[in-house]
Swiss-Prot record:
It comes from the Bacteria. PANTHER family: PROTEIN SLYX (PTHR36508:SF1). Disulfide bonds: none annotated. InterPro entries: SlyX. NCBIfam families: PRK00295.1 (NF001421). Belongs to the SlyX family. This is Protein SlyX homolog. The gene is slyX. Gene3D superfamilies: 1.20.5.300.
Length: 71
């Protein structure tokens, strides 16, 4: 079956429009995910800083494998 040139062009234009919509949707998701990643990185940095502060304040925990005294 030979499709007419006009039909083929219309089909390609339709596919292109759907591809443009898909690319935009994927880009929107990517931007949202990047924001989440950046927020998580900031939270991780804050937690690491807080951990360092606690270690400086209370010292490191020495875990010799012995159960705590209440056992």
């Amino acid at each position: 079956m030979n499709m007419s040139l006009e039909t083929r062009i219309n089909d390609l234009e339709t596919r292109l429009a759907f591809q443009d919509d898909t690319i935009q949707a994927l880009n929107d998701v990517l931007v949202a995910q990047q924001r989440v990643v950046e927020r998580l990185q900031m939270q991780l940095e804050a937690l690491a800083k807080r951990q360092e502060e606690l270690i400086e304040e209370f010292g490191s925990v020495d875990d010799d494998g012995a159960p705590p005294p209440h056992y």
